[in-house]
């Protein structure tokens, strides 16, 4: 399902801004010197429609073939998402210039990190600064130097036939052609030396170390085919939660992979800090807040020799969004692998809140009732709040669904036809439900 949805274009960026970032001397004129880039590739049918395959033959940048853009002769910021179904991109510029990485998945780094190449795996995000000062009238290409990728990294394979064969495999290719124009007013012309101070998690404060495994499915009974990859020796089961994580737990997750292939591992709910990859501390560009980490394939191996597994450790604090009913996912960010069952789930539980509130009635009032515009909700217990609200009509048809609703300004029901409706609230802490009736006149 995920592969199909991504193929059809369901994927993009949300740009989050705050007062700390806005105080820095960074480009932020959207579309001028602050440019989002979603990288992906597609295969086209003879009728010019997307086909659902792991690798495409054509590079698309912001869903544009042979993309090009004009940028000013100054420092330009690119916010880049690898939105590919499977492929990693070894980013670099055609003239070998350096560029500065200023963020990882979860926000700003302590300082810009200057590189000439950077491998961005599926689902990962970075922001980079490129200094084009004094280069008006010239051009340069952002490229994928995928001929340099190892054969067990997505995009580094070179299959001539079969479902993974593609024109771009193990090749270098253009991502974006940049035409450099005139400098703008109030241009940023230098890259800052420092950014912010991240306070990272301390391994000594971990409450537990959880050990996960990644493996190939070959030879295992009841697992689909030799091309499937699995987490913790099982396929995904929507009715099974692998872990119950207490709210406010600080945890080390240690992932050991005997898979020959590398996998970008993604976790929902939290941002984490990488502790080590095969015993080595993360690079400066990987030392910030992350939610995707690349788990390398094992090294060595052959007949009678299983090879040496790779081991990646990260640390995270699960300090919000406790919900014993609705789990969070962790999975490979290669969509095909995820769809084949390379995924697990966990719940974050707040036992104190449940114990305090499980026997507490949900006392709530709706006003004005009847209404034809806004409907306001008031909890009698100030410690209670809405986790989820559903509005249905008298036939049971769902008309409104509001996860984590903001209730201060009321719920707009002006679009509802005149009649009787039922509003069901799931309370945020106890997860108990209550239903109230209101009238739209």
Where are these regions (language model features)?
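Acidic-aromatic/histidine active-site loop/patch
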Residues: 30-75, 79-85
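A glycine-anchored, Pro-Gly-centered beta-turn/N-cap motif
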Residues: 74, 249, 326, 331, ...
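C-terminal outer-membrane/trafficking sorting elements
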Residues: 355-367, 371-441
């Amino acid at each position: 399902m995920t592969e199909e949805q991504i193929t059809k274009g369901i994927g993009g960026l949300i740009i989050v801004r705050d007062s700390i970032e806005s105080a820095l001397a960074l480009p932020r004129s959207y579309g001028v010197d602050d440019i989002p880039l979603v990288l992906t590739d597609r295969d086209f049918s003879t009728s010019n429609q997307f086909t659902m395959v792991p690798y495409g033959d054509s590079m698309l940048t912001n869903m544009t073939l042979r993309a090009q853009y004009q940028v000013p002769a100054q420092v330009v910021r690119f916010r880049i998402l690898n939105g590919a179904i499977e492929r990693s991109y070894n980013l670099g510029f055609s003239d070998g210039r350096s560029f500065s990485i200023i963020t990882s998945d979860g926000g700003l780094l302590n300082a810009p990190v200057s590189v000439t190449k950077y491998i961005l795996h599926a689902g990962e995000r970075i922001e980079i600064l490129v200094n084009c000062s004094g280069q008006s009238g010239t051009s340069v290409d952002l490229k994928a130097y995928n001929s340099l990728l190892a054969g067990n990294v997505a995009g580094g394979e070179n299959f001539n036939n079969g479902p993974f064969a593609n024109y771009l495999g193990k090749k270098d290719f253009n991502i974006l052609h940049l035409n450099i124009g005139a400098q703008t007013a109030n241009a940023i012309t230098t890259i800052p030396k420092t950014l912010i101070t991240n306070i990272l998690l301390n391994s000594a404060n971990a409450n537990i170390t959880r050990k996960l495994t990644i493996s190939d499915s070959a030879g295992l009974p009841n697992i689909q085919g030799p091309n499937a990859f699995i987490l913790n020796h099982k396929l995904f089961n929507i009715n099974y939660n692998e872990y119950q994580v207490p709210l406010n737990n600080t945890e080390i997750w240690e992932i050991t992979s005997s898979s020959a292939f590398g996998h970008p591992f993604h976790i929902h709910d939290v941002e984490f800090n990488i502790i080590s990859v095969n015993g080595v501390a993360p690079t400066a560009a990987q030392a910030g807040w992350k939610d995707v980490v690349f788990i390398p394939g094992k090294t060595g191996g052959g007949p009678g020799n299983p090879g040496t597994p790779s081991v990646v450790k990260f640390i995270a604090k699960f300090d919000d969004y406790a919900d014993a009913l609705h789990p969070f996912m962790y999975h490979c960010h290669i969509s095909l692998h995820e769809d084949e069952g390379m995924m697990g789930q966990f719940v974050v539980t707040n036992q104190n809140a449940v114990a305090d509130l499980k026997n507490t009635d949900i006392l709530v009032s709706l006003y004005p009732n009847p209404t034809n515009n806004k409907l306001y909700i008031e909890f009698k217990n100030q410690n209670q709040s809405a986790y989820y609200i559903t509005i249905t009509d008298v036939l049971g048809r769902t008309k409104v669904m509001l996860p984590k609703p903001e209730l201060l300004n009321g719920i707009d029901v002006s679009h509802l036809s005149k009649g009787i409706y039922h509003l069901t609230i799931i309370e945020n802490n106890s997860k108990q439900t209550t239903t109230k009736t209101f009238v739209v006149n």
